[in-house]
Amino acid sequence: MELENINSDIMDRVISEMNNYDYNSFTDEDIREALNKDYLSVRDFQALLSPKAMNYLEEMAKKAKECRERYFGNSVYIFTPLYISNYCDNYCVYCGFNSHNKIKRARLDFEQIEAELKEISKTGLEEILILTGESERYSSIEYIGEACKLARKYFNNVGIEIYPVNVEDYKYLNSCGVDYVTIFQETYNNEKYKKLHLEGHKKVFSYRFNSQERALMGNMRGVAFGALLGLDDFRKDAFSTGYHAYLLQKKYPHAEISISCPRLRPVINNIKIEEEFVSEKELFQIICAYRLFLPFANITISTRENSKFRDNVIKIAATKISAGVDTGIGAHSEHSNKKGDEQFEIADRRTVSEIFEKIKTEDLQPVMNDYIYLKD
């Protein structure tokens, strides 16, 4: 596949702001000023991500909760991922699917995919995220497209988290029923990125960076962003993720924007990398800052986090939660019978019904679907 270039200045703007971001320069006055505003500037967002803002977590949480209730009410959206292949052509040193890792590989055929979809649909879920390893050879666009057509038979909302593709490919996938695209930049530090991604198309930083914009050019309704917090300086990566989403929202105001906040987790046969530890308090700070800077964006909290943390954060800032998650291949139905190994370890293994009931006990409203398709 020839990697498409698009005419966009967003990457240069994000990298420039990230390089100039000195999070140790902010004062108590900067934090208080940001918290007194209804709408944050970029500098306000930077202030709330600073170490100094850790002293204001209670105030940030209160403000974030007010913002969440203003724009989302008490709704919490529920979805689940479905991994259909774990073959990968990339060598990302931190990932369980990387091409050098000796794991059990598998790719579901269409009969197995449909069996998985049927089983998941019995839970009442109406949104699903289709995931593959990043291998065009084993997971072609046509294969993914057919899988998404099957998914639309059972689910109202279908998202994908696959390798980045060109605009025409996104248009094709949209015609197969795909609504939104999730791409994690992993880290926005290009030099660190080179050290972590050693083989495959993922080595090309700029192509991955522009994926969300190509997806919107390819008629997708929404896009999701995320850095894998802990790979590098997490404050700069958190800022860059939010600023990237902010600039794309300004350029494409019709787009639905989502932010994910994953932290680095153990994987099978993982080699030692220079991990930047991110505490739960620091992750909570980041999520609150995202909510205040991007009030209309969905914020997804991953099963990489434990159940107690997830339950707390959906009451304050996050709006979307995964349930019934297994990152292995063929993990949901007896027909598929767990054919391939997991991408990473998860911390919250609750079922859909368990999370559904927990949300209700917190006086929140679990939502399976909020989008209606109108046929011509």
Feature-to-residue mapping (PLM):
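Auxiliary Fe-S-binding modules of radical SAM enzymes
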Residues: M1-A53, K250-D376
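Glycine-enriched alpha-helix->loop->beta-strand junction motifs that scaffold or abut catalytic
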Residues: N174-Y180, N219-M220, P295, K315-I321
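Catalytic cores of alpha/beta
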Residues: N166-S175, D232-Y246, N306-I316
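Core AdoMet radical
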Residues: S99-E114, I120-A215, R221-F225, L231, ...
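Alpha-helix N-cap and loop-to-helix initiation/capping positions
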Residues: L108, S139, Y143, E199-Y207, ...
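Generic structural signal for well-ordered alpha-helices
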Residues: T80, L117, I144-C148, Y170, ...
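Conserved, mostly hydrophobic/aromatic
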Residues: A64, C92, I130, I183, ...
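Canonical Radical SAM [4Fe-4S] cluster-binding loop centered on the CxxxCxxC motif
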Residues: E66, R70-Q112
